[in-house]
Amino acid sequence: AQFLANRGYAVLQPNFRGSTGFGRKHLQSSFKQWGQAMQDDITDGIRHLVAQGIVDPQRVCIGGGSYGGYATLMGLVKDPKQYRCGISVVGVSDLIWMQELGYSDFNSYRPDAADAFFAITMGDLKADRAMLEQYSPRRHADKVQAPVLFVHGADDKRVPIKHAEGMRDALKAAGKPFDWLVFSGEGHGFLKPENRLEYFRRMEAFLRQHNPP
């Protein structure tokens, strides 16, 4: 946020439902709301800033990491006219994959606990499968209108790189623009200083190209 503010951008970091530190009710209000009410919280925040005269509604980009990467992709699918570009960092692209990919560290150590957690917070693979498909960005890539920058660690064990590759391939098949940045030897986040610097350089260049301050 400080980097983007330093480059002249207004930055919104909403505590959408499910954010920690706001009590049980706030947390539970996010259950089975990926791409739904959780996504609407972000959209409502943008509309509030627009109403306050802080943000030009025609010059908004969305970006984030992990769940924020998912929210980026889902925002581009759900509100394609709202955003000029998106930056998905180690983001989830398919809610079914998130549960079925056995090589994610989230569900490989204690599969039974992971299954129960996902069934409560994201949706049950059987009972809620149609909902999970509906709110998986990879399955609706044709709705995306804005260019996307993907940033991922090749060795990500939390959100395997297949999520980025799957969304990239779906965008390519739909004729949609994207940029691609993968760091070898990195996981669910970037630890090497040279990689962090390159990430910031690419993010700044991408934003200046598609949504200059």
What label would you give each PLM region?
Residues 1-7, 13-213:
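Active-site-proximal cap/loop segments of hydrolase catalytic domains
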